Amino acid sequence: MEYNTSELCDLFADSVDVVDPIFASFGGRYSFGGEITTVKCFEDRGLIDRVLAQPGAGKVLLIDGGGSSRRALFDASSAQVAIDNDWEGVVIYGSVREVDSLAELDIGVLAVAAIPVNAECESVGEVDLPVNFGGVTFLPEDHLYADSTGVILSPEPLDLD
């Protein structure tokens, strides 16, 4: 499904939060949304890969990587795992790599930066906890909507009918 965050902000101004404009789009899908699952980790991607291996239909993985631009938490192989498990998209408060390959894949990917250095893979981190960045607190099961204009967050799914 395609989303227009500008229109959603007009329609649901009192019930959405707008995330600060800190992200660039790296995936081949520019509009995506769904219920979020959160991961908090720092320069370690092992837990991310484990979560993406689970069914993700209608979900967006939201990663708080501390905003690090020293190591990439997500790449084309992670994106393929996400696609294979039906995730709608991934939002990373951190970095990605293999950006040319990511751009060819049908998944939404937003991140702060790109760097060629891979993160560790020791599965250090936490899943399904509140995280805060971009001027917003993200709670597990909140609903995120993203497009080329921005990212918005709602505690409930928005009635788009």
Swiss-Prot record:
One GO BP annotation of this record: regulation of RNA metabolic process
GO cellular component: cytoplasm
Keyword match Mitochondrion: no
Function: Globally modulates RNA abundance by binding to RNase E (Rne) and regulating its endonucleolytic activity. Can modulate Rne action in a substrate-dependent manner by altering the composition of the degradosome. Modulates RNA-binding and helicase activities of the degradosome.
Gene it is expressed from: rraA
Name under which the protein is recorded: Regulator of ribonuclease activity A
Pfam families referenced in this protein's UniProt entry, alphabetically: RraA-like
Organism: Alteromonas mediterranea (strain DSM 17117 / CIP 110805 / LMG 28347 / Deep ecotype)
Family membership: Belongs to the RraA family.
Any one GO molecular-function label of the UniProt entry: enzyme binding
UniProt-listed PANTHER family: 4-HYDROXY-4-METHYL-2-OXOGLUTARATE ALDOLASE 3-RELATED, REGULATOR OF RIBONUCLEASE ACTIVITY A
